[in-house]
């Protein structure tokens, strides 16, 4: 019985790991707002790597009831993996507390283009800062 449970756990974990997409940080130059492609322009309160935003990320996840403080103790990169279902490199750029910038709208924080948006802009993954002309 125990060997069946162990085998199932191993296969399930391997399947999860193989099916989880990886997010990679962009290395090309910062785009202008016209080069965001199909992504929208977001105005984010905090922008930085998962490692540099560890404290605000932990607070946001706990405040919004997405995870318990026990899970946050595992580390912010693991939390993003569990909550978003996306494997995040510690150096990928994230945007926190973001909202879409309307055409002609203004932003009092950092404007970015992001590849993945989760929880109505609470966490955006794969962001690139926009040079405003």
Swiss-Prot record:
Residues 1-25 form the signal peptide. One of its GO terms (molecular function) is structural constituent of cell wall. GO terms for cellular component: extracellular region; fungal-type cell wall. Coiled coil: none annotated. InterPro entries: Hydrophobin (IPR001338). It is found in: Secreted; Secreted, Cell wall. Disulfide bonds join 36-113, 43-107, 44-98, 114-127. Keywords: Cell wall, Disulfide bond, Secreted, Signal. Pfam families: Hydrophobin. CDD domains: hydrophobin_I. The keyword Signal applies. Its main location: secreted. Self-assembles to form functional amyloid fibrils called rodlets. Self-assembly into fibrillar rodlets occurs spontaneously at hydrophobic:hydrophilic interfaces and the rodlets further associate laterally to form amphipathic monolayers. Belongs to the fungal hydrophobin family. Aerial growth, conidiation, and dispersal of filamentous fungi in the environment rely upon a capability of their secreting small amphipathic proteins called hydrophobins (HPBs) with low sequence identity. Class I can self-assemble into an outermost layer of rodlet bundles on aerial cell surfaces, conferring cellular hydrophobicity that supports fungal growth, development and dispersal; whereas Class II form highly ordered films at water-air interfaces through intermolecular interactions but contribute nothing to the rodlet structure. This is Unclassified hydrophobin 14.
């Amino acid at each position: 019985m125990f060997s069946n449970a162990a085998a199932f756990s191993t296969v399930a974990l391997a399947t999860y790991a193989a099916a989880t997409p990886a997010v990679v940080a962009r290395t090309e130059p910062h785009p202008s707002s016209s080069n965001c492609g199909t992504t929208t322009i977001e105005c984010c309160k905090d922008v930085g790597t998962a490692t540099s935003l560890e404290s605000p990320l932990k607070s946001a996840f706990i405040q919004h009831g997405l995870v318990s403080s026990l899970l946050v103790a595992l580390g912010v990169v693991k939390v993003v993996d569990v909550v978003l279902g996306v494997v995040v490199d510690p150096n990928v750029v994230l945007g926190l507390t973001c909202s879409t910038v309307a055409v002609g709208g203004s932003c009092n924080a950092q404007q970015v283009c992001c590849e993945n948006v989760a929880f109505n802009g609470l966490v955006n993954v794969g962001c690139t800062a926009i040079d405003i002309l």
